[in-house]
Amino acid sequence: HQLTRRQRQMCIRDRYGTFGIHPHEANTNSINKDQIIKNVSKNHKIIGVGETGLDFYYNNSDKVSQINSFEEHILASIELNKPIIIHSRNAEDETFELLNKYKNQNIKILMHCYTGSLELAKKMLDLNSYFSASGIITFKKSADLNNTFNFIPSDKILIETDSPFLAPVPKRGKTNEPSYLKYTLEHMAKIKNISPQEMELITSQNFKKLFKVN
């Protein structure tokens, strides 16, 4: 059946988006700061810039194009005063160097689907960054990552699905979906030695604080 206008409004009331060019697409979708700002400003429901960053694992785009695109996104996020969502793979030093370049310009950073080292986490915390955990933290071979999230303060942690990828244990191998988020949340609660309810409250508050939503 068709939804009423009010029902449609209710469905999207608490839904938000971000705008950016993934590093895989940096070659074929070049974009500058002003274009990013224009697209983000089209809709008040767009609350961040990204996912952007550097991926030197797949190298679907050349490094120069990735770095140029990343820096344009950084500049746009600063001018818009909105968080930038970072994808970083096999590019820890380069990612930090670019972000650190703008540390005195009130840049707001979210390290998306964080799987980086403890050393990078420490440096990113000096930039007042947030870190988002995906289902990867539930995997058997993620002991080091679990230790890293144990070190990261709870008030700097968010939880994500990365759907349709990275379904958490016990749903690993299946197409990921939002309903599986609870497994990642429960695992993070164990890492932090608090209840899932407390973890849910903390991560929700962190999201609202970072993205300035009620």
Predicted regions and their residues:
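Thr-Gly-centered strand-to-loop micro-motif
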Residues: I86, M111, S132-G135, E160-T161, ...
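Single conserved hydrophobic/aromatic residue that forms the stacking wall/gate
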Residues: H1-I12
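Mid-to-C-terminal alpha-helical segments outside catalytic/metal-binding sites
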Residues: S179-N214
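Non-cysteine beta-strand/loop elements that form the S-adenosyl-L-methionine
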Residues: Y16-F19, I47-T52, D155-P164
